[in-house]
Amino acid sequence: MKKLYVAAMIVGLAILFLVVNKEKTALLAPQEPENPFEEIIKQENKKEEKPKLTVAEAVSKIDRISLKENVEYLASNELEGRMSGKKGNKIAADFIKKRFEKYDLATEYDKFSIKRINPGPKNEIGDDFTQNIYTWIEGNDLVLKDEIVVIGAHMDHIGYGPSYSRYGSNRIHNGADDNASGTAALIEIAEAFAAMKGQNKRTVVIMAFSAEEMGLKGSLHYVNNPKFPKGNPDIKKHVFMLNMDMIGYLGKSKTAVFDDGSSSPDIGFIIKQLSEKYSFAKSVTLRGSGGSDHAPFYNKKIPVAFLHTGLHDYYHTPKDTADRINYDGLEKMTRYGFELAWNVCNAVERVEFDYGSFTEMDYSHDHGQKDMPLEVTP
């Protein structure tokens, strides 16, 4: 009996040893994770998200140094006055494209036909086509992203003249203020919006128009052949257009803001607030003032604002050169333009068009200045 008891004890201890040893082996054996990428995913999730920029931080990215560099190149002799259909105009478009892409923004050309009007000897040979160039940043709101805010400036000028020149000069017209200034501002505003990517509720389209000097052909082409919303383009989905044309001659405490509420009381309110912030104590409303790329949008009953610092003696002459630009003022105007567009992009409600005061704008190329003083002071 005693032998059986001892044998049973030995067998029991042996079984216990095997069980314990198996458990230890299982604990020591390498375990395959359920998801082989689980650890990588965990590490990625631990990474801190890139902090979102504030509007003030985005505004600070707009600086006079970059503006000056862009104006100087766009208004250089190399581009020969950026005449639509000519080589210099295409170089300007490619330059803008590279700048947009530098900010990781998708960019597209929109080609259209042009006809020359009374071409001079230096402008008689050129393509029958030119192009707008644009980028866009989709809105983050599931509903409002289909509402489109356009920020525009024309990139073309008048080449060598002479038919477009005030004095019939047959020399390069560099077009620094008209409109390398607005184009440089457009590039800087693209950078600011790119820095705020993912924070704009509405989709913003940033577009450099061509053939403005030939009768607003670039903007007319766009309003009749819209590209947005993507997949279902509709000009009626466009809620605001900001146009910047000749914004390089800002004087001390003065500016001119056309259509500052004449097309929309909502826009007028935003402009009033920003004008106080930027010490633009006075602005000018000229109901029905056309002559630049906002006019085709206005005639489609889209609220507009037109930033412009006035005509001057160098307008459409070979003396409109980069060294005459007020770059501190250009920086101020560009920052103002960005904040204006940003406010409209993120407004709770769509800005309303003032149908009661609608008078169709003409497309005459005088910037509506016949009734406007060239200096607007407090």
Where are each of the predicted segments found?
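Positively charged n-region of N-terminal signal peptides that target proteins for export
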Residues: 1-4
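N-terminal hydrophobic or amphipathic helices/low-complexity stretches enriched
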Residues: 25-98, 102-107, 378
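Second-shell loop/turn segments in exported
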Residues: 53-61, 77-87, 119-124, 168-179, ...
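Catalytic-core environment of secreted peptidases
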Residues: 61-79, 97-107, 131-207, 227
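Solvent-exposed loop/turn segments at secondary-structure junctions
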Residues: 78-81, 100, 106-107, 119, ...
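A non-catalytic alpha/beta surface segment that caps or lines the substrate-entry region
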Residues: 82-138
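Acidic/histidine-rich catalytic neighborhood of metal-dependent amide-processing enzymes
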Residues: 126-131, 159, 170-266
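Active-site-adjacent substrate-binding region
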Residues: 249-377
